Every structure is written in C-alpha cells, then in structure tokens.
Amino acid sequence: MAMKKLLIASLLFSSATVYGAEGFVVKDIHFEGLQRVAVGAALLSMPVRTGDTVNDEDISNTIRALFATGNFEDVRVLRDGDTLLVQVKERPTIASITFSGNKSVKDDMLKQNLEASGVRVGESLDRTTLSDIEKGLEDFYYSVGKYSASVKAVVTPLPRNRVDLKLVFQEGVSAKIQQINIVGNHAFSTEELISHFQLRDEVPWWNVVGDRKYQKQKLAGDLETLRSYYLDRGYARFNIDSTQVSLTPDKKGIYITVNITEGDQYKLSGVEVSGNLAGHSAEIENLTKIEPGELYNGTKVTKMEDDIKKLLGRYGYAYPRVQSQPEINDADKTVKLRVNVDAGNRFYVRKIRFEGNDTSKDSVLRREMRQMEGAWLGSDLVDQGKERLNRLGYFETVDTDTQRVPGSPDQVDVVYKVKERNTGSFNFGIGYGTESGVSFQAGVQQDNWLGTGYSVGINGTKNDYQTYSELSVTNPYFTVDGVSLGGRIFYNDFQADDADLSDYTNKSYGSDVTLGFPINEYNTLRAGVGYVHNSLSNMEPQVAMWRYLYSMGEHPNTDDQNNSFKTDDFTFNYGWTYNKLDRGFFPTEGTRINLNGKVTIPGSDNEYYKATLDTATYVPIDDDHKWVILGRTRFGYGDGFGGKEMPFYENFYAGGSSTVRGFQSNTIGPKAVYFPHAASNYDPDDDYECATQDGAKDMCKSDDAVGGNAMAVASLEFITPTPFISEKYANSVRTSFFWDMGTVWDTNWDSSQYSGYPDYSDPSNIRMSAGIALQWMSPLGPLVFSYAQPFKKYDGDKAEQFQFNIGKTW
C-alpha cells in the first residue's frame, strides 16, 4: 500500500514538473495536513532542506522518509514554483484501548502484547499492525485448542483525528481429545504409554494432572515424554516418524495419531572420555562408570553430562561444554558413548553484588556468602550462598546470575537477585471451639530489624486466664565467625482454672541468654543460662500437684485450696539445630531437626531436666516442588532427680494448631484427679466425678488437663497446589491435607494406687485428627486456617475443629 501511494505521489510530482525534470532549488517548504506532528519534527525526518537542489529521486526519498516515521497514512509532494508543498494525512491517535470477551487471556497480558507491537494509548494507529495482532491472537487460541476463536479489532473514529480501539474476542470452546492412537508400538501397550501423557482421551476423576483439552504445547511435551520413555529403556534407535492432529468438522473434537518406530534394545558397551579435562580426568572418569550390560538410558546420559559440568564448575570452569555422542553398533546391539569435554577458561570472581535488597543491608547478605571475591569461581559455593539466603527467611525468592566481565577473558561477577518479603509481623491469633469459645493472642516480631539481620520480638497473650509478655533480641552474627547471641525477658500471670486446666495460679518472671555456635553449613550448637522465679498460689489439691509438693518437702493440707509456694531456679540451657531446608519460608525440600533442653544447676530450688526434639522433613514428589509430602514429629521428656519431681507447671501439653489440630489447645493427656474437698470448699458446679466411700467423698475425677512429663506428636501432611491461584501468588499461598496424632503421659503416675481411674502412665492413648489447612502470606499479614475433625479421642478431650491466625506485617 505504501509503495502504491509512493508511486502515485511520484507520478503526480513528475506530471506537475515536466519542465523541471533536471531539478530545481527549493526556496521554501510548506506542509498541509499536520495536526499532531510538529513542523520541526516533520522537517527533521526529511532528507531535503531549503536551498537544496532536488530531483525526482530526492522527492521519492522524502516520501519514503515521511512514511518511515509511522505518523502518516498518506504523503504527497508537489512543486509550487520554488516551494516544495508536502501534503500529509496523519494516522489517527489512539484515545483508548478496551477488550471484550477475553476470558483465557487477561487484560494486562494483552496490553503488554500490544505495547510490544507499538500499539498504546497516545500513539498513532497503524492498521496493518492490527491485522498482525488479530492473526497472532487467533494463532494463540488455536495452539490451546480453541479452533473456533476469532479476534476482531474495531476502530471507532473520534473528533480531532482520534480513535477508540476495541479488541472483540469470541473464544469459543476448547476442542477435546476424542482419541489418541500410537501406531508402531510393540514392547509397550498404548495404554501404558499414554498413562505418562498430560493430554488424555480419558481422564479418571482422581487424575488432577490429565487433561482432555488439546494444547499444542502440551502435545510437544508429551512427545518428548514418549521419546524419553523409550530412550530410558534402551531403545536407542527409537524415532517418532510423524504426528497427525485431525479436527472434527464442528471444530470441537481432536484425534491424535503418533507413528513411531521402536527399534531394538541396546546395551552400553563403554564410555570413552576425551577433550580438555582441565586435570580432572580421574574425577570425570569416576562419573562415567557403568555397570556391565547396563541398558542405554538417555536420562542417565543427560545426568552424567550435568554432573561433569557441575564438577568442573566447582573448580572455576564456569562455561564447560560436554557433548555425548552415542556410537551405535547394530550388529551386537550395543552403544559406545563418546563424551567430549571442553572445560574452557577458568574464571575468577571479580565482585559479588546484590540486587533487590531495599531493606536488608549488603553486609547482612554478604556474611552468608561462601564464595569469596578474588577467588576461583566455585559453582557449589555460589549455590551454598543461595541456600543460606533462602534459609534466612527474609526473601520470597533468591536467584543467582553469573555475568562475564566485558573485556576480561577470565573474570565474572556473581549477582544475587532477591525479592524481599515482609519480615516484621503483628500476629493476632483467634481460636474457636464448640466448648472453648473464643481465645486471643498477639505478638510483634521483626526478624530483620532495620535490615541489620537482628531479630527483635515483643510477644504477648491477654485473655481470661493469662497475661504473658516477652521481649527477645537475637544477633545472628555476634562475632564475625557467625556465633549468635540471643536473650529474652518475660513475665507470665497464668490462671490455670480459667484455661480448663488443673486449678492453680502461677506468677512467674525470668530471663535467659544463649550463644549459638555454627559447626558447619547445616549444624548449630547452642548453650546458655537462665533464671526463673515462680510464685504459686490457689492450688486446688490434686494428685500430680501434691506429688510434686511432697517431693519438694512440702506437706500442704489436702482440704485447703489456699496453698502457696515459691521457687527460684537457675538453668543451663542447651540446643542443637540441623537445618537443610531449601528456604526459611514455605520450604519444599529438606530436613530440619531442633533439639532444646534445660537442666537446673546448683543454687536452684528445683532439680529437674527437660528436653524436646522437633523434626520436619519435606519431600517433593514432582520436579517443580508443587506437590510435597511433609512429615513432622515432636518428642518431649523431663523428670526430676535428687528425689524431686519435675514441676507440674513444666509439664508437656498437646492439642491446638501447633501440635494436634482439631483439639483445644493443651487439653490432650492426663486429667486432674482431685483430693476430696472440705465441705466448705466444695463447689457443686465444678465438673468433677467423685467416688464415695462410707458415705464420704473419695477421689474426684475431672476433665481438667494437667499435662505430663512425656509427649509424642506426629503429623503427615500432603501439600498441594492451591486451586484458582495464579502463578504470581503461588509462593505466597499453601494448601495441605493433614493427619495429626499425639499423646501425653505421666511416667510417675502410679496406676496401682489409683486403680479406679484412667492409667495416665500409658503412652498408647493416642489422639488422632485429619483435616485441611490453608496458609497465606497476605498483604495484611500471615493467615493460617485449619479445619480438623478428631476421629480418635477419649473422655474429657475438648474438640476445636476450626482454628485460624491472622496478622499484620510490615
């Protein structure tokens, strides 16, 4: 079209200037039709200037130059004496862009596509570009199986040479696969081969991966899956001869036929390595060992190539080339693998840079590095730095990029690109149960205080039965070697009776200081000291409580509830952490083991020890880590020594969102057995079941939890992709199905003495529940929802099916 207009304009010029075919001197240049484009801008785009002598060729070049600006639909150049007259028709300006009928493609994606083609509000409209966009969008719909889709660009003229642009979509329905045929397979059935495809002609209800909707990209992936399936089983000559995709007349059905040649199975006869091995031939040879008579396996060959690259990468060879060429012997059905290695140049690290850490200081990230500047590049050291940054929990994502230094043959820069997450939080917890009602708790925590890496927290609980506050500070790098220093102070006023626990009041306060010593990349030891003061009062006489008091040399009256007791204890605190999780926030792979314990030291009123062991293991079952199995355990044990018992207020409890969901917090395990009250103290409204002997009250059984000195909790969780959540938010939302179990018992309970009551020393009284949980790092903060149904419980257990926590982050 442009060339046609150019030809017409040239002919017009020629016919108007027959007498001037030899050219003329331009004394002036005038424009007609300019509206949006400035005269100066138009003049700058022209090769002709006032005073130039021009001929027909110059005029043709002028027309081409004006068309090339993209601002004009039509250009004519005429001569009026010694004046060059340029007549133009500007392209209309796009005033607005709207979309209608698009469901599969979001508006933002469409706008990005249009802008990439130069179509945006305020720019000139090129109608030829619209045709290309229409075709490109329709091709996209065809690739996802929507063959009846159409896209039409509607241009509505507006005053002042403006237009409204509207893209109207008719997406239609996705064509469904009616049948998939594989022709030429003999070793494996068609059903077996198709079972590994994403595309299916039949999808069982339980298959959440299979899809009958045709997509060109998925078919290409399935063909690669088919190829790998055969190559991994020794079929080195396997070939996909052709693929036919047939569409039904109504464009709603798809028939797929894949023609293959299986060939025979081949065994590996040997591996021969050659090339520039950079002095690491022995290590490389070790990576290429094969078992005699082993079938040829394409995946193992690829892994071998990757392992060689990783090996060389650890020694500074950042860009090695490894190529494997199978040499097939059809006579004896063997394959000899020839591996050519070119290690390339060895690289130094010039600089390590960080991008995206707007809050965190560079020093906080740099101290996690194992790769040093000025040293040989080690790919394993770079990866360790990435792992350590992920485990900090400060970042949503951490990516690395090794960039060559321009002009240098042996230097690179290592760039860590991070996306920070909100590490400060104000947490507000709510629980609701049919028997417990509503409970609240709150806390303020900043894990990366002012970007320094310090962890600062103020946590508290305020409800009907407890007032708790705690201030904690941890410096993870108290020394340059990574020794951490942490401390806390706390105050707790606990009314156990109002918490459906055994009746007593404990007002306590204390502090502790802990040092952490890194042993290696994954192991840390901790040691510290602590002090705690406990002031007990209003202790209603019950067996476990009185047993402890007797061991402490106290002999309170079992008919008196107004007993009081105070202790001051100094403890040696210890711990060990093994952490090989892939990241600190929403891990998907790895294991974390945490051991914490304490023991009283001389100068304490109590003499006891206590320890807990927590483990969590994440096992991904797909390459993208979207489907993950999580196993968690928690074990606890404590006891007294020197003839004393562990204090009852140090007992272990289970139940609640952090242990066994579906049960009210802290209510699993032994229940209080009270001594008979004096008549003046007995409250008939208390939920006691009292036995009588000779007309007098004997011991009274209750539903009040007292905990125990031993605990075991386990959980099996299946983490799945969250439905209806886009990829953009996938890292911020986690859905899981879980099965929790747990038990708490008292090893010092004498069942022979209390034969008419449950045996609270029996660890086999296991509670179980199952349910679903949703975790979301929302703009308002972390939200955790769970719904669990207890399916194994005992008398006195309290259910709390629905639990959730909400918070505010900054």
Swiss-Prot record:
Residues 24-91, 92-172, 175-263, 266-344, 347-421 form the POTRA domain. InterPro entries: Bac_surfAg_D15, BamA/TamA_POTRA, D15-like, OM_assembly_BamA, POTRA. One of its GO terms (biological process) is Gram-negative-bacterium-type cell outer membrane assembly. It holds the Pfam family POTRA. GO terms for cellular component: Bam protein complex. Keywords: Cell outer membrane, Membrane, Repeat, Signal, Transmembrane, Transmembrane beta strand. Residues 1-20 form the signal peptide. Part of the outer membrane protein assembly complex, which is involved in assembly and insertion of beta-barrel proteins into the outer membrane. Constitutes, with BamD, the core component of the assembly machinery. The gene is bamA. It comes from the Bacteria. This is Outer membrane protein assembly factor BamA. Part of the Bam complex, which is composed of the outer membrane protein BamA, and four lipoproteins BamB, BamC, BamD and BamE. It is found in: Cell outer membrane.
